[in-house]
Amino acid sequence: MQLRTNVKHLQGTLMVPSDKSISHRSIMFGAISSGKTTITNFLRGEDCLSTLAAFRSLGVNIEDDGTTITVEGQGFAGLKKAKNTIDVGNSGTTIRLMLGILAGCPFETRLAGDASISKRPMNRVMLPLNQMGAECQGVQQTEFPPISIRGTQNLQPIDYTMPVASAQVKSAILFAALQAEGTSVVVEKEKTRDHTEEMIRQFGGTLEVDGKKIMLTGPQQLTGQNVVVPGDISSAAFFLVAGLVVPDSEILLKNVGLNQTRTGILDVIKNMGGSVTILNEDEANHSGDLLVKTSQLTATEIGGAIIPRLIDELPIIALLATQATGTTIIRDAEELKVKETNRIDAVAKELTILGADITPTDDGLIIHGPTSLHGGRVTSYGDHRIGMMLQIAALLVKEGTVELDKAEAVSVSYPAFFDDLERLSC
């Protein structure tokens, strides 16, 4: 696909796609709760539709009228053995969180996905779930999918210190803990996104959070709720960066989720001197509008506790750094290696093709800026965030064309991405 290049400026207002993390979890919580859950503004991207299909295969009645999704939950006990292997597609969230839910179901389930999922490590989830009493293993005697899990109705609580900062692992353990008799304790390596904890409370559950320690006493019965999904800051990030680096630009992004465990990119932009203003903030629902304007940027260092708050935004932050004055260092981001692709290598290789001065390290990137970008042939590696990052990079190309292989990957989280960009382009 030939990408849009040499854009003079970007102007306009966008409603970014609904939050992917909350959309996944809204289906999951609806399925394991008793009663009806209605979901408005659900993200109909490929990953979240994989979650919806997975729970239908477990016997959950889910209706979608195109506007609202209705989940008729019957609690954990209402989940039934799937007739076939559950296909999670490209979704790591689906497979890892479902393992936590299935840990308490007294039947065997097999989960598989695409080629990318088949390279994603699962021991980080399987080990604690096996400690709780589930029988979870790779079908091919490795830690990689396909995964087979046989749950038990006698799950034991766990006291677990996490070796990696992962909201997916934490969430899987919490889903299992909801079904275990007794108090489970999870200690995070670093604070990660807390949508699961918030939604446990929203659906009538209880847990205690003390810094990086989470305590949950089970078993608990949840009750169906009405969920309104805000816009996804991870999708907004591409247009935040575009608005900062394309000359004479001003973009208003409406109803963006502003959960503090997800807003690390806003802190980085501020540190780099970028102009992003929060308008119409709704503190109760953690959302607001974001107004971004073209800015002069300076380099920064990114590492430590902020990394889990922006892990998915690091590819587009790397592009931002190519347009900042000085040397930007990203460290402590080794988790990028086990995303849809090795994002450290992918970002470095593809931006180098376009003329960036960027070097991969074991746990991040070193980026010298500012640099002018030029045309070239690049690939998304089938990774939606790499694909969208490269299109934003192409906007800055003044000479030559940019050809993107595997552009269709963006539909995983943002099916209307190219259309939305076209509406803003001048």
Swiss-Prot record:
Cross-referenced Gene3D superfamilies: Enolpyruvate transferase domain
GO BP of this protein: amino acid biosynthetic process; aromatic amino acid family biosynthetic process; chorismate biosynthetic process
Pathway assigned in UniProt: Metabolic intermediate biosynthesis; chorismate biosynthesis; chorismate from D-erythrose 4-phosphate and phosphoenolpyruvate: step 6/7
Name the UniProt record assigns to this protein: 3-phosphoshikimate 1-carboxyvinyltransferase
Subunit structure as annotated in this protein's UniProt entry: Monomer.
Family to which this protein belongs: Belongs to the EPSP synthase family.
HAMAP family tied to this protein: EPSP_synth
Leader sequence residues: none
GO CC terms, sorted: cytoplasm
Record's keyword annotation contains Transferase: yes
Residues binding 3-phosphoshikimate: K20, S21, R25, S166, Q168, D312, K339
Subcellular compartments: Cytoplasm
Catalytic activity annotation: 3-phosphoshikimate + phosphoenolpyruvate = 5-O-(1-carboxyvinyl)-3-phosphoshikimate + phosphate
Binding site for phosphoenolpyruvate: K20, G92, R120, Q168, R343, R385
Molecular functions per Gene Ontology: 3-phosphoshikimate 1-carboxyvinyltransferase activity
Gene name of the record: aroA
Role of this protein: Catalyzes the transfer of the enolpyruvyl moiety of phosphoenolpyruvate (PEP) to the 5-hydroxyl of shikimate-3-phosphate (S3P) to produce enolpyruvyl shikimate-3-phosphate and inorganic phosphate.
EC number: 2.5.1.19
Family annotation (CDD domains): EPSP_synthase
Keywords, alphabetical: Amino-acid biosynthesis, Aromatic amino acid biosynthesis, Cytoplasm, Transferase
Name of the top EC class for this enzyme: transferase
Superkingdom field: Bacteria
TM region(s), chain numbering: none
Record InterPro entries: Enolpyruvate_Tfrase_dom, Enolpyruvate_Tfrase_sf, EPSP_synthase, EPSP_synthase_CS, RNA3'P_cycl/enolpyr_Trfase_a/b
Active site: D312 (proton acceptor)
